[in-house]
Amino acid sequence: MLPSQAGAAAALGRGSALGGNLNRTPTGRPGGGGGTRGANGGRVPGNGAGLGQSRLEREAAAAAAPTAGALYSGSEGDSESGEEEELGAERRGLKRSLSEMELGVVVGGPEAAAAAAGGYGPVSGAVSGAKPGKKTRGRVKIKMEFIDNKLRRYTTFSKRKTGIMKKAYELSTLTGTQVLLLVASETGHVYTFATRKLQPMITSETGKALIQTCLNSPDSPPRSDPTTDQRMSATGFEEPDLTYQVSESDSSGETKDTLKPAFTVTNLPGTTSTIQTAPSTSTTMQVSSGPSFPITNYLAPVSASVSPSAVSSANGTVLKSTGSGPVSSGGLMQLPTSFTLMPGGAVAQQVPVQAIHVHQAPQQASPSRDSSTDLTQTSSSGTVTLPATIMTSSVPTTVGGHMMYPSPHAVMYAPTSGLADGSLTVLNAFSQAPSTMQVSHSQVQEPGGVPQVFLTAPSGTVQIPVSAVQLHQMAVIGQQAGSSSNLTELQVVNLDATHSTKSE
């Protein structure tokens, strides 16, 4: 039996199994029974009608025709991903389409083969070169060059802008890093993504002016600066001049129970001005990238009720009152309900052991208050971790606790959880500035004077990291009115480590 007759017999067997025609006879001629699959190099059974030769001719014609890519690429000219594919992708699509046409030749006979050759085969409903039932080409590689087509360019911008914003969010959420992303479209719109610490780069007036200045400037010609090219690369550029220090407490996530300061309130009769141990120099806050700001007054309200027993506030602070003698009237430091003096989980500064002396000055308008109260805060450990980090610049922070920063007439603070809704509290705001608003060690004795705050570190200054809050709409509380209101003097002075009074 000749090879062509063997191929025809094999074709007869397959045709009988598929079509159910047992009386079909081979009509092939020599040389036309065995077709060669050019893409795979294997032989397939011929159908006996000379279609093997025509299939070879179709394959040669498709490989030589310049429009063969349009037949198998499956991409429209105006689609968003209509750029040229890689050569390997075209060959894969061509090979898959040829094999599907051969399947039509074997199964359906000459009519199906002719229909497949004309582009109306079984895969005509879907995109050629893709899997059956899939309408798109999937992931293809496009050229990294400017898209001239305006419609395609706008579509690409919309899709990729959304994608890069999503990637920035995922990076900041998964790894806890600070991300600032700014995308300016050619239509004049600016889209941004920024984490909390980097938001003032966009929200502050200085940052907005800088961004607008850069965007409104004419496009500079390419320079020979190598760092500029590196910044425009796909991997970015590490800025060696913009490194910053990350505190250990931010990464370790220490709990609130690590340090528990003890609060002791002692009622002493008479005047206790001899315990004023703060130095007479004014205290300034040294910010690493800004000028020095004087610490203004923090005036804590004092309740007039006498409580000889321990008082527990809403935030868990225990005030223990112990009387050392007969006292006609005394005072307790009443903390705001949303303010806590206990160390928070994430803090940015640790200072040595300090004690807070709150001295209640006698008021001439209320003659019954002839005694003064001394409030002492000591710590049972070597260092006190302050949760209320004092802020003086305009960069927000995510440290735990509360944020405090000075103003001309009061000290404002806000919990970190309240920054999103713009809540900010002004403690003891005054309608006019008192006569002794400067920070010094002068003891106020004249009537109507306002006591002052002393914050003193071992070297006379307190090093505060660069951080601040956004100025939101303020809610003023604690307005002092009338001559009968009690104002206290809050002093933070240095004490030795021997002051280790423990709270029971």
From Swiss-Prot:
Glycans are attached at residues 273, 303, 305, 312, 379. Residues 264-288 have a biased composition (Polar residues). Residues 1-94, 215-288, 359-381 are annotated as: Disordered. Residues 1-28, 61-76, 368-381 have a biased composition (Low complexity). Residues 29-51 have a biased composition (Gly residues). Keywords: Activator, Developmental protein, DNA-binding, Glycoprotein, Nucleus, Phosphoprotein, Transcription, Transcription regulation. Residues 164-218 are annotated as: Involved in dimerization. The modification Phosphoserine is found at residues 73, 75, 79, 81, 99, 220, 249, 431, 442. CDD domains: MADS_SRF_like. GO terms for cellular component: chromatin; cytoplasm; nucleoplasm; nucleus. Phosphorylated by PRKDC. Its main location: nucleus. GO terms for molecular function: chromatin binding; chromatin DNA binding; DNA binding; DNA-binding transcription activator activity, RNA polymerase II-specific; DNA-binding transcription factor activity; DNA-binding transcription factor activity, RNA polymerase II-specific; histone deacetylase binding; primary miRNA binding. Residues 129-218 bind DNA. Residues 137-197 form the MADS-box domain. One of its GO terms (biological process) is erythrocyte development. Residues 77-87 have a biased composition (Acidic residues). It is found in: Nucleus. It holds the Pfam family SRF-TF. SRF is a transcription factor that binds to the serum response element (SRE), a short sequence of dyad symmetry located 300 bp to the 5' of the site of transcription initiation of some genes (such as FOS). Together with MRTFA transcription coactivator, controls expression of genes regulating the cytoskeleton during development, morphogenesis and cell migration. The SRF-MRTFA complex activity responds to Rho GTPase-induced changes in cellular globular actin (G-actin) concentration, thereby coupling cytoskeletal gene expression to cytoskeletal dynamics. PANTHER family: SERUM RESPONSE FACTOR HOMOLOG. Binds DNA as a multimer, probably a dimer. Interacts with MRTFA, forming the SRF-MRTFA nuclear complex which binds the 5'-CArG-3' consensus motif (CArG box) on DNA via SRF. Forms a nuclear ternary complex with MRTFA and SCAI. Interacts with MRTFB. Interacts with MLLT7/FOXO4, NKX3A and SSRP1. Interacts with ARID2. Interacts with SRFBP1. Interacts with FOXK1. Interacts with LPXN. Interacts with OLFM2; the interaction promotes dissociation of SRF from the transcriptional repressor HEY2, facilitates binding of SRF to target genes and promotes smooth muscle differentiation. Interacts with NKX3-1. This is Serum response factor. It comes from Mus musculus.
